[in-house]
Swiss-Prot record:
Lineage: Bacteria, Pseudomonadati, Pseudomonadota, Gammaproteobacteria, Enterobacterales
Tagged with keyword Ribonucleoprotein: yes
Pfam families (alphabetical): Ribosomal_L19
Classification via NCBIfam families: rplS_bact (TIGR01024)
InterPro entries: Ribosomal_bL19, Ribosomal_bL19_CS, Ribosomal_bL19_sf, Translation_prot_SH3-like_sf
Name of the molecule in the record: Large ribosomal subunit protein bL19
Gene3D superfamilies attached to this UniProt entry: 2.30.30.790
Gene: rplS
Function: This protein is located at the 30S-50S ribosomal subunit interface and may play a role in the structure and function of the aminoacyl-tRNA binding site.
UniProt keyword list: Ribonucleoprotein, Ribosomal protein
Length: 117
């Protein structure tokens, strides 16, 4: 029984996911369905947390929009995600960057290395 579940989950997992790390600035293309129209929308921000749980793996992305912090949790293997692009690689020493919620302006920046696809 356990082997059947493991095989099913491995078949459902996406294979083309780039390696994600906290502090990375990513651009996520999402499929949005409105009525009978299907389009994609881009959400760009910094990864502040990753939860590795096999098929249920998720990551939290934070961005500042109109002066307000917006956080969104994405399932890594979700069919809603069209693609994930890494814009910058962050250099951090923490697994969870929740402290960024309390920082504003230049103090909320982290060191980055430029990433070229």
């Amino acid at each position: 029984m356990n082997e059947k579940i493991r095989n099913f989950e491995s078949n459902q997992m996406k294979k083309d996911i780039p390696p994600l790390h906290p502090g990375d600035v990513v651009e996520i293309s999402l499929w949005i369905i409105e009525g009978n129209k299907k389009r994609f929308q881009i959400f760009e921000g910094m990864i502040i947390a990753i939860k590795n749980r096999g098929l249920n793996s998720a990551f939290t992305v934070r961005k500042i929009s109109s002066g307000e912090g917006v956080e969104r949790v994405f399932q890594i293997h979700s069919p809603v995600i069209k693609e994930i692009n890494i814009k910058k690689i962050g250099v951090v020493r923490r697994a969870k960057l929740y402290y960024l919620r309390n920082l504003k302006g230049k103090s909320a920046r982290i060191k980055t290395r430029l990433h070229v696809n």
